[in-house]
UniProtKB/Swiss-Prot annotation:
Gene Ontology CC entries for this record: clathrin-coated endocytic vesicle membrane; cytosol; endocytic vesicle membrane; extracellular region; plasma membrane
Cited function: Tetanus toxin acts by inhibiting neurotransmitter release. It binds to peripheral neuronal synapses, is internalized and moves by retrograde transport up the axon into the spinal cord where it can move between postsynaptic and presynaptic neurons. It inhibits neurotransmitter release by acting as a zinc endopeptidase that catalyzes the hydrolysis of the '76-Gln-|-Phe-77' bond of synaptobrevin-2.
Keyword Metal-binding: yes
EC number: 3.4.24.68
CDD domains reported in the protein's UniProt record: Toxin_R_bind_C_TeNT
InterPro entries linked: Bot/tetX_LC, Clostridium_toxin_transloc, ConA-like_dom_sf, Kunitz_inhibitor_STI-like_sf, Toxin_rcpt-bd_C, Toxin_rcpt-bd_N, Toxin_trans
UniProt name for this protein: Tetanus toxin
Superkingdom of the organism of origin: Bacteria
Keyword vocabulary terms for this entry: Disulfide bond, Hydrolase, Metal-binding, Metalloprotease, Neurotoxin, Plasmid, Protease, Toxin, Virulence, Zinc
GO molecular function, one term: metalloendopeptidase activity
Reactions catalysed, as given in the entry: Hydrolysis of 76-Gln-|-Phe-77 bond in synaptobrevin 2
Protein species of origin: Clostridium tetani (strain Massachusetts / E88)
Gene: tetX
Family per similarity comment: Belongs to the peptidase M27 family.
Amino acid sequence: MPITINNFRYSDPVNNDTIIMMEPPYCKGLDIYYKAFKITDRIWIVPERYEFGTKPEDFNPPSSLIEGASEYYDPNYLRTDSDKDRFLQTMVKLFNRIKNNVAGEALLDKIINAIPYLGNSYSLLDKFDTNSNSVSFNLLEQDPSGATTKSAMLTNLIIFGPGPVLNKNEVRGIVLRVDNKNYFPCRDGFGSIMQMAFCPEYVPTFDNVIENITSLTIGKSKYFQDPALLLMHELIHVLHGLYGMQVSSHEIIPSKQEIYMQHTYPISAEELFTFGGQDANLISIDIKNDLYEKTLNDYKAIANKLSQVTSCNDPNIDIDSYKQIYQQKYQFDKDSNGQYIVNEDKFQILYNSIMYGFTEIELGKKFNIKTRLSYFSMNHDPVKIPNLLDDTIYNDTEGFNIESKDLKSEYKGQNMRVNTNAFRNVDGSGLVSKLIGLCKKIIPPTNIRENLYNRTASLTDLGGELCIKIKNEDLTFIAEKNSFSEEPFQDEIVSYNTKNKPLNFNYSLDKIIVDYNLQSKITLPNDRTTPVTKGIPYAPEYKSNAASTIEIHNIDDNTIYQYLYAQKSPTTLQRITMTNSVDDALINSTKIYSYFPSVISKVNQGAQGILFLQWVRDIIDDFTNESSQKTTIDKISDVSTIVPYIGPALNIVKQGYEGNFIGALETTGVVLLLEYIPEITLPVIAALSIAESSTQKEKIIKTIDNFLEKRYEKWIEVYKLVKAKWLGTVNTQFQKRSYQMYRSLEYQVDAIKKIIDYEYKIYSGPDKEQIADEINNLKNKLEEKANKAMININIFMRESSRSFLVNQMINEAKKQLLEFDTQSKNILMQYIKANSKFIGITELKKLESKINKVFSTPIPFSYSKNLDCWVDNEEDIDVILKKSTILNLDINNDIISDISGFNSSVITYPDAQLVPGINGKAIHLVNNESSEVIVHKAMDIEYNDMFNNFTVSFWLRVPKVSASHLEQYGTNEYSIISSMKKHSLSIGSGWSVSLKGNNLIWTLKDSAGEVRQITFRDLPDKFNAYLANKWVFITITNDRLSSANLYINGVLMGSAEITGLGAIREDNNITLKLDRCNNNNQYVSIDKFRIFCKALNPKEIEKLYTSYLSITFLRDFWGNPLRYDTEYYLIPVASSSKDVQLKNITDYMYLTNAPSYTNGKLNIYYRRLYNGLKFIIKRYTPNNEIDSFVKSGDFIKLYVSYNNNEHIVGYPKDGNAFNNLDRILRVGYNAPGIPLYKKMEAVKLRDLKTYSVQLKLYDDKNASLGLVGTHNGQIGNDPNRDILIASNWYFNHLKDKILGCDWYFVPTDEGWTND
C-alpha cells in the first residue's frame, strides 16, 4: 500500500504521462491549457492562480472587507516560472510530509481510491458517463513529430495555487449547470473531481490563550500554522466531496445585531466536522441524523443506479471493473438477485469513518503540530513562510518542530516569539482587514476624526472626536438563534417498528490507521478516456469580500475597546505614567490606564537615586500581589476562582454598582460577564404519541420499549441542542473575555517594562552596568507573574461558562423535559391499560413497575461526558479521569488507603500480603479467611440508582491454571472482588468479579434478582493467554442505558446489554477476597483498584492503561520490573516458539524449537518455559544504587550462566558478520589482543504495551553496533540456523509490527509450572 510521491521541477518537459498540458474541467472544450504535474495517483498539481469565475480586479487589494479575518493580496504572486517551481517543489515536500506519517498516508490512500462515480443524478440510469466535467478533464498530447491530439483523463483532485486571497484556501467540487440551476455531485453521494485553491507560503496565525497550561507566557502565545496541516484540512474536505458527503445544508450564522459582534461568514457544518474537537458539537444531534439519513438515501439511489448500468459512452471503459470499485468504495452488498444494496451496518462504519475519522484536531496530534484549540480561537494577521524548502527551517518529518534544534517541546518551532527565522510579517497595502470604527465625542465637538491606533492624535482645546479602529477578529462571535434546529421539540409517533436514532457520531483515527495497515491495495483502473472537443463549461462566479469603506459607529460611552486601547503604550521609548482614569489615558498618549493602584503609585514615583533596583523589585512585588488577587462568592459556589480586577480592566459594570465588581457579580451572577444574554427559554417539547395499536403481545411490548428509548433519545437530543447553543452563543463570549484579559495583562506588562526601560536609560548610578542582568531577570519575572494571573482568569471564565450552562440553560431545559415526561408517561400508561387484555395482568404489573421506575428519575446532564472546551483533549482526559475517580486504592508505607479524596475506609486483614505490583506494591490474596481487604465506601459514592454509570478498573495477576487443577476445579466459580449485598431472601444485589477455570466473569445483579454477565474465556494457548501469570489491566464500564463492556489491556473483550436491569442496591462494602474458592493453593494479586463515576470511553481507557506503563523501568515476561543479577531465559518475541541455545563456549548462540504441551481434552496447549540458556544482567559500571531494577537507558553487561560459570556476551573486534552488517555475537570469547565489544544498553524503543526489551550493543568508541536480534544463516559446516547477531538494520524498521530485536526475559516463577 505504499504511496509514491513524484518529484518535479517546473522546467521538466511534458511527457504526456506525469507531466501534461491540462485543460481543466471549467475550461473543457475551450483550448485553454495549463502545465500540470501528477504528484501521485489521481492527484494533479497545477502551479497557477485559481482564476475560474473571477475578474482581474478581484486580485487587487481592496480598501476594506465585508466580513471575516484579515486577508492578504498580491496580484503578482505565482506569475513567474521561478515562483511556479518553488510552489511545485513545496507541494511535493508537503505531500511527502503527509505521506511519512501513517495517519497522513491513510488519508491520501482514501482520497486516491475514492473514484467519483461515472455519472450523477441526471445521467442515464443504465450508462456510465466519462465526458462529464465532474469526472474528467481534457489534455493536449504531443508526439515526437510535434503533432498534437486531444485526449481526456479521469481524476479525483486538481490542486491549483491560491485564488485572489493568498491566505484563503478552499476546496470546490465541480459544479454542473442543470436546468439553470447549480448541481453538485459532491453533495449527492456520487462525488466529483475536487478542485483545491491552496497557498503554502502564507499561513494563518492564532493564539493559545484559552489553554490552561503552565507554559503559557505573556507575549509567547502566538503560533503560525504548519502548511502541511492546512493542506490536510483541505484534503479532508476533498475526501468528503469524493464520497459525495460534502455538507451544504446547515450553517452556524453569526449574529450582527450589535457593534461588538463579529461580521463573519456563516460557518458550515462541513467546516466544523473537518476541524473536529468540541466545536463539532455546535451541530446538534438531529442535524447530524438528518445528514446521515440523506447520505444513506443517496447511497441507496446509487446502488440502484449501479445495478442497472450496462454500457458506457467510452467503449474502452471496463464496466465490471468500475462496478467492483464502486462496490468497494460504497461498501455495497449484493442481494440474491445480484442487485447492489446498502448494508446499513457497513454504511454506518463507512459514514462515521469518512465524516468523523479525519479531523484537523486529531491529525495535528498525530503529526505533533500545534493547531487552534477551538475554531473560535483568536486569529491574527497571516505571515509568510519564505523558506519552506530549507530543511533546517522545515523538514518533511517534523515540520517546524525540529527536535535537534530544541524546537519540538511545546511546539516551539511554531511559536512566533521563539522561531523568528521561520516567518516574515506581512504588511503594506496587500494586508486588508475588516475594521469597525468607534467614535466618541470629547467635549464640544469639532470636525476632527482621528485614528488613535498610533497614539499620534492631538485634540484641540475646543474638543473633537476620539475614533479607534477595531479589527473584526477582536469582536465576539455569537451565533444567531435560528442556527439551531428545533426538531427535538416536534411531535414524534412511536410504534413497534420505530427505528431508534444513533445518538453518537464518532470514529477513531487510530481505528482508521489499523484498518489501513490491514487492507490490501486496490488496483486502480486506466485513467484515460475520450475527450470533449467542444463545450461551454460553467464556472461559478467568485464572491468577492471587498469593501470600499470602513463601518463607523458613534458611541456615547466608553466600551471595552476604549478601555483596552487606553492600556496600550506608545511604540517609542519615552516617559510615560500610569493613571486610573480611562478618559485621561485616551486623550493623553503618555498616560496608560491601569487598574492596579499600588502599581500606579509605585511606577509613577520613579526610581529614587541608587535605590533603582529596589524600586523595580517593589514594582514586581506590587504587580504580583495585585494580579494574583482572587476570591470566592457563596452565591456562586460552583465558581472556585473569581478575579476581582476583571471588572475595571474590561469595563464590566452594573448600574448602581460602579466600582464594585464583586458586589455586582454577587447580585447578578456570572451573567454579568456576558455582553449578549441569549434567550434560554425553549419551545414546548411535544409529548410522544403512539401509532394505532396492535393486538399482538410482542408488538405491544416492543412499542413500549421503543417509547422508553425514544423518551431517552428526546432527553439527550435536548441536552445536546442546549449544549450546541451554549457553545455558539455563551462559551464564545467567555472565551473572548479570556482573550481580552490576556491582551490587558500584556498591555500592563508592556507599560511597566517600558517605564522601567526609560528610567534605566536615564539612570546614572554607579551600579548601572552591574544591575542590567538583574533588571532583565525581573522583567522576565513580571511576565511569569502575569502568566499565573492568566491561569486564574482562565479558571474563572471556564467555570463561569459552565455555571451558566448548568444553572441557567440546563435547568430551563429540565423544566421542559419534566413536563414532557409527565405528559408522555400519561400517554404510555393509557396505552398499557387500553391493551391490558392482550398482555395479561402479570405482564401489566411488570410493565407499570418498569415505566414508573424509568420516569421516576430524570436523565442527568453530565458535563464530564462533554469535552472541556478550554483545555486540549489530552489534558482533558487526565482531568476527566481525576475528577471522575471516586475510589482509588493506593499502597504507601505498606498501608492500603483510598487516595481519591472521598476517603473511603480500608480494613486490611493479616493474611492479605503485599508483593511487587505493576508500579510499586500490590495486594496479594491467598485462599484463607483472613486474607481479605474490605473497603467501606464513603456515602458519597453509593450506587442506588438505576441511571448511575460507573467503571471499575484494576491490574490483575492470576497464576496459570494447570491441567490437573482445571480438571479438578474448572467448574468452581469464586469471586475476587465483590460488592454484592445479601438480603434476607438470599438474593444478592450489586456487582462482582469472579474467576472460573480459565474464565473471568463480570456480574451485575439488580435488587429484583435480574442478572447480566460478561464471561471472558481465555486463550487456549497459555503462552499468549491473559490469565496465565502476567499482569493484565482489567476495565469494566457500565452504561446503565446501554451496555456493560469488559476490556483487557485496553481492548474490548466482551459486552452485555444491561438496559433491562433495575436499581442495583449494592453493599456498602467492597470485598477483595477469594470467596467460595475450592482450591486451597489458589492466589491472585490485585493492583491499582479504582472506581469511576462514569462509563469511561475507549480513549479514556487507553489513556488510563498506558498511564501505568512507565518506560522508566523495563519489565520481565510477567510484567514485573526487570532486575539485575537475576537469571532469565530469553525468548524472541518474533519467534516465540524458540529458545536460545549455545554451540560452545567462545562460540555463537542460536534458536532452537522449544518443547510444547498439548491437552486436547481440555483444549490447552503452549510452549514450555524454562528451557535453553540462562542469562544474567549486570551493571556495566558498578555503583551504589539501592534498587536492583533495570531502567531503560541503563548500560549493562549480559552474561550467560553455563555449567555453573558466568560467561560474557559480546562481539569481538573484526569478528564474523553476515553481509558485513549483522555481527555475530559470541559467548565467553577471550582471544588475546582482540577486544570484545560488550557494552550494551537495555532500552524500550517500541511497543509500550508488550513486556519486551531491546538490547543495543556498542563498540569501544560508543558507536552503535546495532540491536540484538537474529539472522538466518550458516556458519562453516553447521546447519542453517537463526543466529544471534547485532545489527543497525533494526533501527530503520522500528515501526514494523513484528521485529526480531524484541526479547522476553522470563524468570522462573511459582505462578507458572509446566504440566
